[in-house]
Amino acid sequence: MYEYRKMTPAQRREAVEYRRLRERPWHSPPHWEFQGLLQFTISSACYEHQHIIGATPERMTECESTILDVCSHFATHVYAWCILPNHYHLLIQTDQLGALRAELGRCHGRTSFKWNGEDHRRGRHVWHNCLNRGIKSHRHFWASVNYIHHNPVHHGYVQRWQDWPWSSAADFIEHVGRETASKIWREYPVLDYGKTWDFD
């Protein structure tokens, strides 16, 4: 639905009707309710992909700390994360997905208020909705790890994963070793992962 604002009125009506018939939120990504302890990717973007998070390095660090703090209360494990100037990605394990999403929503509200004050932009829409996807397989898990760690390279911010400071990539490489990280990259390629929904 990120293309919604670019659609004609007829295309918008058709898109909303399509979602309504499938009992999905009319203007937002669906949030599937899963039972039990499961793994998910969670992604969220700044409204219209503006580089609001990345206004300053300090704000990037603040966003990273805030998001990871939320995860520390509602996730049993954070496998991978990456904070970029206009969006973030997480790979987590949780049995409290609803509570985690709710707290991320509150976190988005607090950061919106704070950042809009700092930027003298009261009323600016900062965040778009979160999207969560359940991990379906071993291959999906490792492709997600690779995708998240590769994201700063994909978007042209750095040449190597470990050079991006707002990511778990350097810790991951240190933990598993460069050789194992390279093997995982080769065995679980990103290919077109995220092509239709990642945030430029």
Regions found by a protein language model. Give the residues of each.
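Short catalytic/metal-binding and nucleic-acid-binding patches
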Residues: M1-D200
